[in-house]
Amino acid sequence: VTRVRELTGAGINVSFGHDDIFDPWYPMGTGSLRDVVFMGLHVCQMMGYGDIMNSCKFISTNAAKTLHLGDSYGVREGNPASFIVLDAKNYYDALNRSAAVRLSCKNGRALAETEPAAARVRF
C-alpha cells in the first residue's frame, strides 16, 4: 500500500478503485466503492474523523480527476444526472453503518431503490 496520507498532504491526487468483481483474483469483490474506501482507510491507518469525512473524494472527485473526466463530472447543468443517495446523515455515518443505497440513478433514470429498513431493539 502506498503512502496515501503523505501523498494527499503533498497535494498529489490519489483515488481508490478496483475492477475485480467475483473473479479468480478477488472472489470477494462486489463492486462496492464503499468497501474500497473502508478497506483503504483501515490499511492506510487513516482513522481520524477528518480522514474519514474526506475519504469520499478518493472515489468521487479525485477519481474523476484520475480518469480525466473534466467538466463532465459533478452536479451542474448539462451533466448526466448519475448519482446515489445513501441512507445516512453524512459520509462518516454512511461508512460507519454500511449505509444502504436508497436510490441509484444513471443519466437521470432511477436504476434501483431500497426502502428504509425498520429496526427495533428490545431489551
Protein language model regions, located:
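His/Asp/Glu-enriched, well-ordered alpha-helical/loop segment
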Residues: T2-L86
